[in-house]
């Protein structure tokens, strides 16, 4: 696969995730030292599902993130472009509707969802701005966007230590827990190429979201961005 900062072909990324689907959640918990579960809880708080709402969870993978949104009266749609991930998700969580979807061309109607969320998937999209525009399109007026993504640690010393872990230790450790360690080499590359917190916030605003903000998690290893689709003009 070409380096993440040069190209992100959808078919290549999908095939890579097909290969790791079976053990993906366990590997993530191990390689993040349990932080992945904490981040999912923080995303659930940001989404704050309410009865009567319909929530779209993009890049949902096996549905590990989607389960937290299952509240009485809440409809959850889990979408992903990896058939391997979707197969695992349908097997593990039959109570959730799983849909094959490309984030840059969503198979949903305009203004269909109260909340759209995507966790650790926006980096893998070929056209980030187009994907954010599609999310805006399918949101209802006043609807909420929640993006959870790897980010940049503000502290330079800690950031350098984290980069060393990503580039030198993560690939070696992943080889012990995954049959496709190249997926985690791609992870390190894509994190390194990803815009910092403020840059992503500006892009979200550029697309047309209002009241955009972000909160760092775990020293800034991850950031949760939020924004809202404008209400229709009277």
Q: What name fits each language-model region?
A:
Residues 104-116:
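A short acidic, Gly/Pro-enriched loop at the edge of an enzyme's catalytic core
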Residues 11, 148-203, 207, 213:
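C-terminal alpha-helical "lid/dimerization" subdomain adjacent to the S-adenosyl-L-methionine
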Residues 54-105:
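Class I SAM-dependent methyltransferase SAM/SAH-binding core
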Residues 33-53:
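Conserved alpha-helix/loop element of class I SAM-dependent methyltransferases that forms part
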Residues 201, 207-234:
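Core SAM-dependent methyltransferase catalytic element
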Residues 114-128, 151:
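A short SAM/SAH-binding and catalytic strip from SAM-dependent methyltransferases
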Residues 1-23, 177:
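N-terminal, positively charged/glycine-rich alpha-helical extensions of SAM-dependent methyltransferases
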Residues 129-141:
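A short glycine-rich, Lys/Arg-flanked "PGG" loop and its adjoining helix->strand segment in the class I
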């Amino acid at each position: 696969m070409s380096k993440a900062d040069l190209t992100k072909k959808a078919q290549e990324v999908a095939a890579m995730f097909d290969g790791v689907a079976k053990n993906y959640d366990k590997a993530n918990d191990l390689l993040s030292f349990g932080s992945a579960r904490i981040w999912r809880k923080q995303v659930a708080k940001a989404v704050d599902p309410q009865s009567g709402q319909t929530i779209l969870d993009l890049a949902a993978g096996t549905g590990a993130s989607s389960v937290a949104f299952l509240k009485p009266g809440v409809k959850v749609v889990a979408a992903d472009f990896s058939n391997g991930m979707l197969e695992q998700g349908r097997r593990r969580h039959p109570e959730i509707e799983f849909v094959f979807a490309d984030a840059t061309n969503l198979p949903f109607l305009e203004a269909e969802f109260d909340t759209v969320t995507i966790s650790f998937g926006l980096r893998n999209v070929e056209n980030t701005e187009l994907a954010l525009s599609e999310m805006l399109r399918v949101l209802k007026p006043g609807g909420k966007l929640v993006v959870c993504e790897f980010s940049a640690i503000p502290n330079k010393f800690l950031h350098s230590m984290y980069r060393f872990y990503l580039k030198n230790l993560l690939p070696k450790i992943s080889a012990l827990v995954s049959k496709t360690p190249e997926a985690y080499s791609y992870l390190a590359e894509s994190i390194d190429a990803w815009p910092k917190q403020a840059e992503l916030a500006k892009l979200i605003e550029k697309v047309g979201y209002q009241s955009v903000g972000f909160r760092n998690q775990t020293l800034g290893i991850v950031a949760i961005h939020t924004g809202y689709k404008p209400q229709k003009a009277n």
